[in-house]
Amino acid sequence: MATKSGEQFVAVEEAARLLDVTKRHVARLGDLGQIRYVGRGLVDRDSIAEYLQERDFYRSRAWSEETAWGAVALLSGLHVDWLGQVQTSRLRGRLRELAENERGAHELVGRTRNRARVMRYESYGFLAARLRKEIVPVSRRRLGLADTKQVDGYIDTERLAALEVKYGLRRSPRGDMTMRSTSFDISVVQTIASRGNGALAALDAAGSMDAREHGAGSRALATHLEMFAEGRAHD
């Protein structure tokens, strides 16, 4: 039986209705850690709300992983050598168009989502210290946000798969370890994170479910788009 709308948990049938999917798909989302099961046949309501909010970014057609990282690099004031000249020129034009759109920053979050798959894991014991050495962290200080003490960064997809097996990592939508899994050249990601102007941090924060982080990231991302359109991405 479905719970009342004000309660913290909902039955699978109600979760399927809220998500507009089948019960089997609800189970699949639970297995992927995108929503959270709290018991037999019960789903955490907040995890459903967070999932739906995240889907709002997905209304725009996503760019490929290479194009997404190309956009991040251009906004970061860095050179892009993995895209063709014509493709890079078109991407520059698209970024300028987004700069003129009041919802350009919001759309960019959706367009670049394929740069990485965000995975959250439960943290315990020694894990945080060890996994922190495996990731490419992205400083948020330019956003006026303190760098998080939690594990949050980019990691090669194959390396993450190996770590899941090695440490028995458990996925959870409310986990406090965030691993941004990408199959793109992780050394390039490292360069963008360490030598860029902060656009990557703005993009990460703009996609956050936390209201303060989302606001700071969205404002900064809009500024990065404006600076790019004005030819000041290197500033």
Residue ranges of model-derived segments:
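Generic recognition of long tandem-repeat/solenoid scaffolds
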Residues: V10, L42-V43, G153
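C-terminal regulatory/effector modules of DNA-binding transcriptional regulators
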Residues: D156-D235
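Residues that form generic nucleotide/phosphate-binding pockets
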Residues: Y51, L74, R94-L98, A205, ...
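Short helix-start
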Residues: L32-Y58
